[in-house]
Amino acid sequence: MKRKAIILGTGPTGLVTAWKLLERGWKVNLIEKNSISGGLCRSWKEKGFILDTGPHIFHTPDKDLKKFWKKNFNDILVEGKFFCKNIKGKNFDEFYDYPFSKEALNLFEPKLKEKIKKELKFYKNPEQRRKAKNYKEYVNALIGPTLREMFFEKYPKKIWGIDTDKMTPDWAPNRIKFRNKILPFYHEEYAAVGKYGTGCVYDRIKQKIINLGGKFKFNETVIGLSSKDNNITHIITNKKKYLINNDETVISTLPVSITAKLLGKQNNLKFRGVCSVYIFCQRHSILPKNIHWVYFDSKNVLFNRITENKKLSKFVAPKNKTLLTAEITYSLGDKFSKQKPKNIIDQVLKDLEKVKLVENYNVIGTSINYEPYVYPVQFMEQKNETFYIKSFIENFNNLFSI
């Protein structure tokens, strides 16, 4: 008798899990609340453009993973060398290369450059990092206070919504490379994007699943899980109640906080969401030459990152037109999440003019998308709850949360 899996969610994790289980002889059903698969990596067409939930790059230094990607998706991946910059300054006219390099540091004003070099020598102390009690202390011990204040203070707060001294040290980057030269963001790694948006890769996986006998149930939201003696007995959706037999395994790819709540375990685990505003422009290109995305840590503009998707793949926008994605992080229930979509779009357009990227007369259309569960937030005082909730879920014999 074939073993059977019921997978909740059809994002990358759910799709790849289904694909590989089917290849091993399992029967697989997938339940998805949206009308299409792909989760946070889905793509869709709108007004002649291909939109992503957010720009995604397939990158890895692992040769086996590169081989796997090229074997299965080579014809729908566009390899590239991708560059980005931090845009700062009162007039948004200061451009800083990222990741850091000695070449870029040498372009700094002499006094600032010397100060940073001294701090890099003084603070290069593993013992200080081990003693760090929060993100701020850890980054200080890694690169010194000057670079931290320039690049790792305002931006993390804008992304996560909390001060860096309230964030745990493990949020901090484990290491910050100082390269000799200004090089692509993903140096010495395979890097590519989906030719027709990230979703085209996951659409292919979906087709592989169908060809192997997997079944999809779209537009169906899981609203509860019933259990008895540490086994899941039923999956309840907005359409149906599914009985789980002894030979069936439930695999949840939903956020761990949601999986716990479906089992009746309330919790305070939080996520940061991403609102993406799409700007369709009657221009060939917008960002500076060879720049694919830019970061903004300023409180005076709504967005934290702007990506020109057509620079990643020319196939996502019509000829002589381009597409910008403005990303804004938020939390469910905060002031931003209560704004009307039109007001958000209008503010993004004003801010794009402010940073001198887009004039309104170039804009031929806009759209907006919300993803409320993107980045798991871990306040220092909630770290124990994360372990507690994961342990609670692991107690169920026929349930896996991945």
Language-model region placement:
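N-terminal Rossmann-like FAD-binding beta1-loop-alpha1 element of flavoenzymes
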Residues: 3-30
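Mid-domain catalytic core of redox enzymes
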Residues: 24, 223-342, 347-361, 390-391
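Conserved Rossmann-like nucleotide-cofactor binding loop
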Residues: 13, 36, 257
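Active-site/ligand-binding neighborhood in enzyme catalytic cores
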Residues: 104, 112, 116-227
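A short alpha-helix-loop-beta-strand transition element characteristic
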Residues: 64-92, 146-150, 268-272, 286-288, ...
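Glycine-rich FAD pyrophosphate-binding loop
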Residues: 22-45
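FAD-binding beta-loop-beta segment adjacent to the flavin cofactor pocket
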Residues: 314-319, 371-401
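Dinucleotide-binding Rossmann-like beta1-alpha1 core, especially the glycine-rich loop
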Residues: 47-127
